[in-house]
Amino acid sequence: MKKSLLATVVLVLFAATAMAQQLYVGSYNIRYQNNDDARDGNGWKQRCPVVCAQIAFEHPDVLGTQEVLHGQLKDMLQLLPDYDYIGVGRDDGKKAGEYAAIFYDKQRLRLMDSGHFWLSETPEKPALGWDAACIRICTWGKFRDRKSRKTFFFFNLHMDHMGVVARREGAKLVIERIRQLAGHTPVVLTGDFNVDQRSEVYTIFTTSGLLRDCYEHARQRFAENGTFNNYQADRKTSSRIDHVMVSPAFTVDRYGILTNTYWNGQGDQADRRLPSDHYPVFVHLSF
């Protein structure tokens, strides 16, 4: 009798595990292409193969990216053939300015719907929001797993680096849009918030009842540093301004901030460099 009961429990647990949807997601501010970085030895031409190799190796199912210019987007798609993307340039809703692009594995996931809105008083058109220094945008997609047929929403944003009011009101707007678009469907939110875990904006998200910080709820965590490095490999901080948040429907299995470096140059002339001025965050989820 005891053996029969034990066998039943094992079968139930196995079935529950088999039914759980595994999802690997991430957030990566890849740093926009500019001449100053190139002059300082951190040009996109040398960083791009490293950034893309890192993404290809991790192979997330969905990745929220920030600061992607259109030329960089084309470079990444060429080196990441398993992926497609959604997103528009923030300056005109087409190709101008930075994208908050969402890359997704097109073999694994089917894109059901997508859109974007600006973090401003006029969310449907490009505009500076409140006291922001730059135009800011949020991209979203509705995805369905081709095998399990489970559905989820993915939101990705880049908040302003200057505007305190813009970040606060932008956070409220994102929460409102998540409620409207996703309803009770599981949600992932990624992005460069430009503020850390001690900020008002972080609290707006984590006390909304909709989202939880994956860092705080991970069963297993590898995070030896914060997420902004300013191209300084020896910089140590506890500040996390790049976040991955999920609805309570998700179990956060593993969370990692990956602090990889690479060598630029040959032999004794090589120097250690970082792929971006932000470290990527990757998270294993199940739901």
Descriptions of predicted regions:
Residues 1-22:
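Bacterial Sec-dependent N-terminal signal peptides
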Residues 18-79, 90-98, 172, 287:
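N-terminal, active-site-proximal structural segment of metallo-dependent hydrolase catalytic domains
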Residues 22-37, 100, 112-117, 150-160, ...:
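Active-site-proximal beta-strand elements of phosphoester/diester hydrolases
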Residues 31, 69, 158-160, 193-196, ...:
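Catalytic metal-binding/acid-base residues of hydrolase active sites
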Residues 62-153, 256-258:
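Structured beta-strand-rich core segments of catalytic domains in phosphoester-bond hydrolases
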Residues 64-66, 88, 188-192, 213-216:
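Active-site neighborhood of phospho(di)ester-bond hydrolases with catalytic His/Asp-centered motifs
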Residues 165, 169, 176-187, 195-287:
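Metal-dependent phosphoester-hydrolase catalytic domains
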